[in-house]
Amino acid sequence: MNIQQAIKQIVKKQDLSQNEMQKVMNDIMTGKTTDTQTSGFLVGLAIKGESIDEITAVVKIIRSFTKSVTIKNTKHLVDTCGTGGDGLGLFNISTACAFVVAAAGGSVAKHGNRGISSKSGSADVLKAAGVNLNMSVERISKCIEKIGIGFMFAPFHHHSIKYTTNVRKDLAIKTIFNIVGPLTNPAKVPNQIIGVYTQNLVEPIAHVLKKLGSKHIIVVHSKDGLDEISIADDTFVAELKNGKIKTYTINPTNFGLPLGNLDDIKVNNADDSLILIQQALDGKDSVAKNIVALNSGAAIYVCELANSLQEGVSKALKILNSGVAHQKLDDFVRESTGC
């Protein structure tokens, strides 16, 4: 199937099979389609709604072109990454969580990029902290094995995406590439907590990752619109564990945490975000600390360092109050520039 045939099919609201989608996406990722064709295809998919098989196929193709990072011990390997696009301008919660999980004994292969729709992307705030973003795959692997955290800057690992960059900028809408970003971790992490920008993606993404062989996954979207576990409202969850998917709703009060005001954790830039991250990692009582505890607790749970979400959040709070998570940030800055 070529892209013209695919467009004709999706405008009829007909899903593509995995094989059909892989053929079309391979052509896009190798520069064999025009910008007009790629644009029409992406818009058509977005209007139709991307199916589980279509998303799975795109992830497979992107992974096949990815510059991979090899991690020897994957038992507690995890990523904390979201689709972004919630438009709320909050600080980099999932980035802060990475240091808490590392302090808990996890191995965090953090996948991220500069801010596109947000005030601060994970790459922006890490650069503000002094982290070297231009590490080779070997150095990233060493950092993960030595201190429990490494950062994989998306443009370095996904060169083939370049064929879609201009089209996506011109379209200025969410496309399938926004959905698959967190699913294309270069270290092939078996465990993840993933935030998505709409509730409609929560359960489908869990099914995609089941098809792709993931081990333990939590996908979240909150009632108040976050691609994180919210400190201010209910959060919808799909959990993949032992090959089975279950859905449920959680609230901060389930974990003994008070509801917080999201206005307290909004930022204007990466420097603002870094301040909130440092305060949370120092254990300063705040909305920032509590939302980091919720999300890092989920990550601690999915990478098998806690037996339940409740235990994971409890461990995260103890780590935050001890200040050792901030030490992990300092260690990472040092190792990224010299390891």
Swiss-Prot record:
Cofactor binding note of this UniProt entry: Binds 2 magnesium ions per monomer.
Metabolic or biological pathway: Amino-acid biosynthesis; L-tryptophan biosynthesis; L-tryptophan from chorismate: step 2/5
Annotated positions binding anthranilate 2: R168
Enzyme class: transferase
Keywords: Amino-acid biosynthesis, Aromatic amino acid biosynthesis, Glycosyltransferase, Magnesium, Metal-binding, Transferase, Tryptophan biosynthesis
InterPro entries linked: Anthranilate_Pribosyl_Tfrase (IPR005940), Glycosyl_Trfase_fam3 (IPR000312), Glycosyl_Trfase_fam3_N_dom (IPR017459), Glycosyl_Trfase_fam3_N_dom_sf (IPR036320), Nuc_phospho_transferase (IPR035902)
Family: Belongs to the anthranilate phosphoribosyltransferase family.
Binding, 5-phospho-alpha-D-ribose 1-diphosphate: 82, 85-86, 92-95, 110-118, 122
Name of the protein in question: Anthranilate phosphoribosyltransferase
Subunit-level organization: Homodimer.
EC code(s) of this entry: 2.4.2.18
GO MF, any single term: magnesium ion binding
Record's catalysed reaction(s): N-(5-phospho-beta-D-ribosyl)anthranilate + diphosphate = 5-phospho-alpha-D-ribose 1-diphosphate + anthranilate
Keyword Transferase: yes
Function according to Swiss-Prot or TrEMBL: Catalyzes the transfer of the phosphoribosyl group of 5-phosphorylribose-1-pyrophosphate (PRPP) to anthranilate to yield N-(5'-phosphoribosyl)-anthranilate (PRA).
